[in-house]
């Protein structure tokens, strides 16, 4: 069964390493793999340690910087254990996405990240329904499953320059991106490419999209692989799951919807609302954020690979002192103030 606790997850990784699941007679399996360091894997693993996001997050009404918490230390310890026991890909901090994919296509990976599993495994879409989605893990640090989710509103970035002769029209256009129908257009493109209407007025996949929907969508959907401003809240509108092949819904879409309903939706929590900092707060924190991101990325790799001993209290204290010296208090103070304003605004609306 899919593991639901941190201990069960560890046991599964050991089985991937030792039991030759690909059946080739060689111990060539990599239990847990990723690319670009822990950037993508991390978001699935830190919730097991009571962390919603490895950055600024809200916990019990207070804003904190998660990498400076004791929860982060437990995460580092666990990942170091996986690395030392070769349960974590030894190339996780150096390999590209294509290198990870090559391992997946060779049937060597047990657990990995990707938008869809077949992007890494190389399987056909219909075959990928046998690859289950990761289930949020409980542990001694997290009693209930926890799945970080977005607010449903994607602010992204947009700019209107002084050369724009029609800023009002541009604002109307940007505002329109938050309309569910427009959001759907941005996600799956205009009629006739990914989808078309059947005789009953219901959307169905075009013949071209039935072969490889993502290949077709990548050519016509404006927000494919991009962070666009827009409305994400209603998955029925945004993701277009009513698309069918004839009278049948795409089996893979059905699979993804069910996996999400079972494993993500019941446990979803937003790490931190979309906050707006004042210009003064931005000026104070901008450099701090950049410095901390670089520092944490480097220290995370050192702790996990054992270059620094995460079990050494003196090493840990030095790590915390470095974070504090970069302006942690200023950063938390600014985000706490912005969070308090967000709470107050909500109370006024209600």
Model-derived regions, located:
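Helix-loop-helix "hinge/cap" segment bordering the ligand-binding cleft or interdomain interface
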Residues: 1-39, 55-103, 158-169, 173-200, ...
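Ligand-binding clamshell of periplasmic/extracellular solute-binding protein-like
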Residues: 3-10, 32-49, 111-121
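Secretory-pathway/luminal and periplasmic proteins that interact with or process carbohydrate-rich
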Residues: 17-27, 38-45, 51-54, 109-114, ...
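Beta-sheet entry/capping signal
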Residues: 27-33, 108-112, 128-133, 157
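Active-site-adjacent "gating/activation" loops or surface patches in catalytic cores
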Residues: 56-61, 75, 126-153
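Glycine-rich, aromatic-lined ligand/substrate-binding cores of catalytic
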Residues: 81-84, 100-117, 122-123, 137-142, ...
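Conserved small-residue motifs centered on glycine
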Residues: 176, 181-302, 307, 344
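Histidine-centered catalytic/metal-binding microenvironments
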Residues: 299-350
């Amino acid at each position: 069964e899919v593991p639901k606790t941190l201990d069960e997850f560890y046991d599964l990784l050991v089985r991937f390493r030792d039991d030759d699941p690909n059946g080739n007679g060689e111990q060539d399996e990599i239990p847990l793999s990723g690319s670009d360091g822990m950037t993508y894997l991390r978001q699935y693993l830190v919730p097991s340690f009571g962390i919603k996001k490895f950055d600024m997050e809200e916990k019990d009404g207070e804003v904190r910087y998660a990498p400076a918490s004791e929860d982060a230390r437990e995460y580092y310890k666990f990942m170091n254990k996986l690395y030392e026991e070769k349960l974590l890909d030894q190339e996780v901090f150096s390999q590209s996405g294509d290198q990870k994919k090559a391992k997946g296509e060779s049937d060597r990976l047990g657990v990995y990240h990707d938008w869809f599993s077949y992007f890494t495994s190389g399987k056909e879409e219909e075959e990928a329904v046998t690859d289950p989605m990761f289930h949020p893990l409980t542990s001694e640090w997290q009693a209930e499953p926890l799945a970080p989710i977005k607010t449903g509103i994607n602010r992204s970035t947009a700019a209107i320059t002084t050369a724009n002769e029609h800023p009002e029209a541009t604002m109307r256009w940007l505002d329109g991106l938050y309309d569910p129908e427009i959001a759907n257009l941005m996600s799956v493109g205009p009629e006739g490419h990914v989808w078309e209407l059947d005789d009953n007025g219901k959307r169905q996949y075009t013949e071209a999209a039935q072969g490889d929907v993502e290949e077709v969508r990548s050519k016509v959907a404006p927000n494919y692989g991009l962070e666009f401003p827009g409305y994400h809240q209603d998955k029925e509108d945004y993701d277009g799951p009513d698309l069918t092949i004839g009278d049948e819904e795409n089996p893979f879409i059905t699979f993804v919807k069910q996996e999400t309903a079972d494993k993500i939706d019941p446990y979803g929590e937003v790490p931190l609302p979309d906050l707006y900092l004042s210009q003064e707060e931005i000026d104070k924190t901008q450099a701090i954020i950049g410095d901390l991101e670089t520092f944490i990325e480097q220290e995370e790799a050192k702790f996990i690979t054992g270059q620094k001993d995460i079990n050494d209290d003196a090493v840990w204290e030095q790590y915390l002192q470095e974070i504090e010296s970069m302006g942690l208090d200023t950063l938390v103070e600014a985000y706490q103030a912005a969070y308090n304003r967000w709470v107050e605004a909500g109370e006024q609306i209600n």
